[in-house]
Amino acid sequence: MRTTTTSTTHLLIFLTWLASIASASAQSTKAKFDPNEPLEKYNMPPAYIYRLETSPRMISPFGAFISFQVNVDAQGNNILGDAANEPSIAVNPTDGSKITIGWRQFNSVQSDFRQGGWAFSTDGGVHWTFPGVLENNVFRSDPVLGAGDTGNFFYLSLRETFFDDIWRSTDGGQDWTRLTFGDVTGGDKQWLTIDNTQGMGHGFLYQAWSTGGNNFGGRQFSRSTDDGATWMSPIFIPNSPVWGTLDVASNGNLFIGGAENFSSPFRCVRSSNAQNPAVTPTFDQNTQVDLGGNLLFGGGINPGGLSGQCFLAVDRSGGPTNNNIYMLASVEPFSGGGTNVMFARSTDGGLTFSVPQRINDDPVNPNKWHWFGTLAVAPNGRIDSVWFDTRNAANNTDSQLFYSFSTDGGVTWSPNVPVSGAFTPFEGYPVQNKIGDYITIVSDNTGGDVAFPATYNFNPGTGQHEQDVYFVRVVPGGGPTPTPTATATGTPTSTPTATPRPTPTPRFAPTPRPRPTPGPRP
């Protein structure tokens, strides 16, 4: 019975993989938003794990960049048969060597039951400790992490009920304490930001979520004024933007970016009084933003998920670009065909935005995908953007992580640079046909820390590559010790030299090359 079940599962996985390849290559069946989009809900029980097997941890160098596997066991090994995706990263702003990453942890690819996984590093991302999940056998999804200015980490997690809860770590991500109990906030695709300015909203936590998987009649926003312990009753956001993020300007104004109609147009919504604990926040500015296309759900590159969310970030450098607002997303052009990383900026507090600007600098090709685009702003005002890119793939689907930066407020961007080897996004699916919905980056004055999923490890038991979470540090110019190119407003946080600890012999990824479509397993 075990052999028959396993063979059937492998056949289904292979057929799904073939369908994904055909969809991505043909470019003829890409779907816009479906109101019946699968939400992050409990579908299957945890899979029984007969025996936990391991292989050496993956370390994948590419030029001057090295990607380190994050989801490893207590001995530093890769865990065969599991899956990890949708990573969110937080970095201690007072000590850049202390990093934590949360992700959707699937203990077995035989079940889409997922939990709140996390790992921490104390040496700048070279070595990682994966203690386990927030709560054993508790369904969780959509992990979103953030850091307060004193170094506390926060972990926002969606539960199967479509309510969320928030956890805090005061020791660099080694231990977590749940702060909220009961059903007070949350919905599908929730996001978090923390007010790290020195105004009256200092330390406030803000979160917004989708109108889908929503228990509050479409209300999407809440605030905590006591470090996450309690939250106000949710309120409406004008035009109901979804699948986006939030950030706070240096004057304490809160900005929310997202997509209207689960597609486009995009919105930038401001609250200037959310920082005032004595009032219920109101939204006093609402701007339509053109990013040159639509957010895409069910595209051929990530069939069961998004091709990326909308990311909003605010410049708090104190320099010439201070309080600029930036929005970026991987969008499908209105004419159709693939996705591009598109960017717009506001220099007047979100009142108006620039025309959309294409960040990926390869020739326009509707068969190529530039997906999971994200961005962050460094304390010195440099903007970093990373995304998955298929420009070098003969099959138009094998993906690499690419990087570009801007030191003039997004007016010009550096030539795009690949920073990882290529991987196939169609293998290692944990029943659901996606590799998450987003990747994340945190920037400091000398570079950016990135968390992303990839399928570098190969599992001989399934005959497929596996979804795992990786960390890579990107730097302007690609050198190991970059110098900031804009005026810094604080002491730069450099990446410390790692102190090695005993680990198994790492396995290195080969130089990426186009791979043929694999044949079926018998």
Labelled PLM ranges:
Residues 5, 20, 273, 348, ...:
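Sequence-pattern detector for short linear motifs
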Residues 479-521:
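Ser/Thr-rich, Proline-interspersed low-complexity disordered segments
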Residues 1-2, 520-522:
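Accessible peptide chain termini
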Residues 22-26:
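Sec/Tat signal peptide C-region and signal peptidase I cleavage site
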